[in-house]
Amino acid sequence: MAVRKSRQDWVDAGMELLRREGQQSLTIERLTQQLQVTKGSFYHHFGNLANYQQALLQWWEDAFTHEPIRIAWQEDNAQKRAQRLGRAVRDLDHPLEIAVRAWGLRDPEVARTLASVDQQRLECLTGLHRDQGHQQPELLAYLEYTAFIGAQLVQPAPDGAARALQQALDLWREHDP
């Protein structure tokens, strides 16, 4: 008897395929092959591919944006929040972030989700910089965020890249008290 797959099993399988093979691998046939189940299980959980893709995007937005922000905001001051957010962001699955962004170049729905996520992340960073007393919080947030996105694209990541990026951002902050 086949093992039943949960909705989360399907999401996990899709994220793994997306990370390894790109969005073109997100087909019902490829997913059922990956999970070794019938298409009926897929349709039971999602109804169609569009609903499945929406579930993937929702999971990604929650795990890669809402959860790191939630974790950071458990801290009681802006400096600690910034440090906690930095740790949470460093621990993200960056190849998956790249795969979602590449998908967004080809799919308008994904692009809309990315625009929303980018806005949420920028607002979070702007708030952190404002709370730390920086005079140009929007500019600093934009610089920090675009450096984060760009740094993910350098392949392979040079040794010490995360540290170098952090040092550059710290230097910038010193000039914007």
Can you annotate each of these PLM segments?
Residues D9, A13-E21, E67-I71, V100, ...:
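Solvent-exposed, amphipathic alpha-helical segments
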Residues G104-L105:
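Acidic, metal/ion-handling microdomains and their immediate structural contexts
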Residues M1-K5:
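N-terminal intrinsically disordered/low-complexity leader segments
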Residues S6-D9, A13-N51, A55:
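Helix-turn-helix
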Residues T65, L92-I98, P108-H134, E138-Y142:
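Amphipathic alpha-helical packing segments from all-alpha helical-bundle domains
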Residues A111-A115, R130-P177:
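Hydrophobic/aromatic-rich alpha-helical bundle segments in the mid-to-C-terminal region
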Residues A55, H66-A99, E144:
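Hydrophobic alpha-helical connector segments
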